[in-house]
Amino acid sequence: MAMDDYDDDMSSVGVTTARIENQHQQHPHQQGQHGHHQQGQGQSQYSAGAVKVGGWRYEDASRYIGEWNQRGQKHGIGHLQFADGTRYDGQFQEGLSQGVGCLWFADGAKYEGEFHQGWFHGNGIFWRADGMKYEGEFRGGKIWGLGLLTFQDFTHGFPRNEGFFQDCRFMRRRRCPEVVQRAQKCALMARSQCEHPY
C-alpha cells in the first residue's frame, strides 16, 4: 500500500477541547454582598479600588491566581487550576484564555500555543497521552489547517501524516515545514510565558 493510499482509523485524530473557562468569569469582589460568585476565599491587592493581582479558591475547588481587570475578570497573566487536575497557565482576556498559554489535562495530554476566546486557536502543539503529537494550526478547539501528526510508534500505521486537517480529520498530504516551525515557535513562547511568579 502506498502512503498516498493510506486510510485507517487514525485519519480522525480525536482532538476536540472544551472552551477553557470555568463558571467563575468574575472576581467575587465585583458582585454584590449576596452575588452568585461570592462563594470561595481569596486575597487580592487593590489599586484605586480595582483588583490587580490576587488569588481565589472557588467553592467547586478550582483556583485562580493572577491578574484581574477593573470589572473583576481574569485578565493578564494567570494560573487556573480545575478540581479534576486540569491546569492552564498563560494569558487571559476578559475571563477567557486569550493569547499564548499552556494547558495540561488530568489524563496527561497537553497543549502549548495560541488561544482565542477560550479555545485552542492559531498555532501550537498538542500531545495526547498515548504519545500522538500534532504540530500545526487549530481552529475553535479543533485540529484544523496545515500540520504534522506523528506517533511514537507504528501502532497506528504510518508514524507521520503531514498536510491539511479539517475538523480533526486528515484530508490530504502536503508538506508544510513553515507551519510546523510557526507552531514550535508559538509553543516555545507559551512555555516561556508560563514561567511566571504565580
UniProtKB/Swiss-Prot annotation:
Coiled-coil annotated spans: none
InterPro entries associated with the record: MORN (IPR003409), MORN4 (IPR052315)
Segments of this protein annotated with the region Disordered: 23-46
Repeat (MORN) residue spans along the chain: 64-87, 88-109, 111-132, 134-153
Keywords: Acetylation, Cell membrane, Cell projection, Membrane, Phosphoprotein, Repeat, Sensory transduction, Vision
Entries under SUPFAM superfamilies matching the protein: Histone H3 K4-specific methyltransferase SET7/9 N-terminal domain
One Pfam family per UniProt: MORN
Residues that bear N-acetylalanine: A2
Alphabetical GO biological process terms: phototransduction; response to axon injury; visual perception
GO cellular component assignments: cell projection; rhabdomere; rhabdomere membrane
Tissue/organ expression: Retina. Expressed primarily in the phototransducing compartment of photoreceptor cells, the rhabdomeres and its expression is dependent on ninaC protein (at protein level).
Knockout-associated phenotype: Severed rtp null axons show significantly reduced and delayed axonal degeneration following axotomy whereas wild-type axons degenerate within the first 24 hrs. Rtp-null mutant flies exhibit age-dependent impairment in the termination of phototransduction in the retina. Photoreceptors show a conspicuously high level of spontaneous dark noise.
Topology in membrane: Peripheral membrane protein
Keyword Nucleus tagged: no
Keyword Acetylation: yes
Subunit structure comment from the entry: Interacts with ninaC.
Main function: Plays a role in promoting axonal degeneration following neuronal injury by toxic insult or trauma. Organizes rhabdomeric components to suppress random activation of the phototransduction cascade and thus increases the signaling fidelity of dark-adapted photoreceptors. The rtp/ninaC complex is required for stability of inad and inac and the normal termination of phototransduction in the retina.
Protein name per Swiss-Prot or TrEMBL: MORN repeat-containing protein 4 homolog
Lineage per the UniProt record: Eukaryota, Metazoa, Ecdysozoa, Arthropoda, Hexapoda
Gene transcribed to yield this protein: rtp
